[in-house]
């Protein structure tokens, strides 16, 4: 109830303002700031996420949740790294005690690829499953969603590309029921239906989605995150931070997402470092899990250049997504924030920052990244300088690029990529 109350209070602080297109000169570049007429007279369509079951130990209730959803034989989907961890056995044990059959599919890599999704579909059909449980980090949950998209119909996986016409799904071919169980606090993948999948032939990540794919339930159990190593806790935590920042500064009128983003920033600002430095602190783990969930809700509104770049770097070099975001974040903030005084002030308040100037905000973010031992450049994680042109061209095709608050073309994004590779901070 406290989280809901805080979101409502956050929403009460926002007002809709009529905004105009303005030209911005910075470092001899002309950049056009994306604006929309944020009027209460506009028509807007807003959705809100799935039923969420939060609390330590809630994984023990998944059997009853399945029964309430009339699920009898789910396929459990996770990534290779999670397949032997204790929470998988705990999940299967709870299901077994509830009289629910299950099988495990764990052939999902850190950056899921199309062939893995097809293999998951085969496993689902061969096992006569009636639902999917996605458990793990963002890769496992994205894999689960991508399998859901294609397993009951004849459409090619890439037909569900967010930028393509929506495939028409017959009622007989509707998507399986889907339960999400995050075991990292970062991606927020449990809150929305999109899946990021790499097309190996093109070396690109694509955002796959369908408006009829709905998550049936999400279980947020912070006890499942207690075993995360500090590095992964930091990387996924900054992923959540990036979601909240990028979503909040998208120039669209969406008070539900904006309220979720601000509350996410408050929780992440309070608990991110603590969850890394005190890994057994259940309160900190819970705060981060809720913050990650709210940040995931917030990016229903859109993201920006950090994610557009990170998606394509990950597709080519198989880098950890949250870590890649963490490195690129300050570079894109320097590009975006000088023209966002009002929103920057709101974010600084939520994060507890005293200096609300653009330099002060970025400086405090960089200090946090230093404390979390985030590398200072993409070159430190194996990304070569010569890829900058190729990555920037691909990034401009990513759906996240279209909602970055400051306009930029391939040339501007190439500069951001080059800075990120050489020296991000």
Give each language-model segment a name:
Residues 3-17, 21-105, 424-425:
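An N-terminal, well-structured beta->alpha segment
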Residues 186, 293-325, 399-402:
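Glycine-rich phosphate/pyrophosphate-binding beta-alpha loops
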Residues 316-388:
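Gly/Pro-rich interdomain helix-loop hinge
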């Amino acid at each position: 109830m406290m989280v809901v109350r805080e979101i409502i209070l956050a929403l009460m602080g926002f007002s809709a303002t009529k905004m105009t297109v303005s030209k911005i000169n910075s470092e001899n570049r002309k950049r056009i700031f994306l604006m929309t007429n944020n009027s209460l007279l506009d028509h807007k369509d807003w959705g809100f996420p799935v039923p969420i079951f939060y609390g330590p130990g809630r994984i023990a209730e998944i059997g009853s949740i399945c029964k309430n959803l009339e699920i009898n034989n789910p396929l459990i989907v996770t990534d290779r790294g999670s397949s032997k961890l204790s929470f998988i056995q705990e999940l299967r044990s709870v299901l077994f005690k509830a009289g629910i059959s299950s099988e495990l599919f764990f052939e999902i890599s850190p950056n899921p690829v199309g062939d893995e999704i097809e293999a998951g579909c085969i496993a689902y059909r061969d096992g006569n499953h009636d639902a999917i449980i996605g458990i793990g980090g963002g890769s496992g949950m994205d894999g689960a969603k991508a399998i859901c998209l294609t397993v009951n119909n004849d459409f090619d996986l890439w037909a569900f590309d967010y930028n393509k016409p929506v495939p028409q799904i017959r009622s007989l071919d509707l998507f399986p029921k889907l339960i999400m169980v995050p075991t990292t606090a970062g991606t927020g993948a449990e809150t929305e239906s999109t899946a990021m999948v790499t097309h190996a032939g093109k070396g690109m990540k694509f955002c796959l989605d369908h408006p009829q794919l709905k998550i049936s339930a999400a279980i947020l159990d912070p006890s499942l995150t207690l075993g995360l190593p500090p590095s992964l806790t930091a990387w996924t935590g900054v992923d959540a931070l990036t979601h909240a920042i990028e979503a909040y500064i998208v120039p669209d009128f969406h008070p539900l997402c904006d309220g979720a983003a601000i509350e996410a920033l408050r929780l992440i600002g309070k608990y991110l470092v603590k969850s890394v430095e005190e890994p057994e602190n259940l309160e900190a783990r819970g705060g981060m899990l809720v913050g990650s969930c709210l940040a995931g809700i917030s990016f229903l509104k859109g993201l920006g250049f950090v994610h557009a770049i990170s998606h394509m770097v990950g597709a080519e070099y198989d880098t950890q997504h949250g870590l890649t975001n963490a490195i690129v974040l300050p570079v894109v903030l320097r590009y975006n924030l000088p023209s966002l005084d009002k929103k920057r002030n709101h974010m600084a308040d939520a994060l507890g920052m005293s200096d609300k100037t653009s330099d002060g905000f970025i400086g405090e973010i960089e200090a946090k990244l230093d404390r979390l031992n985030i590398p200072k450049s993409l070159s430190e994680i194996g990304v070569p300088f010569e890829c900058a042109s190729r990555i920037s061209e691909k990034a401009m095709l990513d759906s996240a690029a279209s909602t970055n608050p400051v306009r930029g073309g391939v040339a501007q994004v190439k500069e951001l990529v080059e800075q990120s590779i050489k020296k991000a901070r």
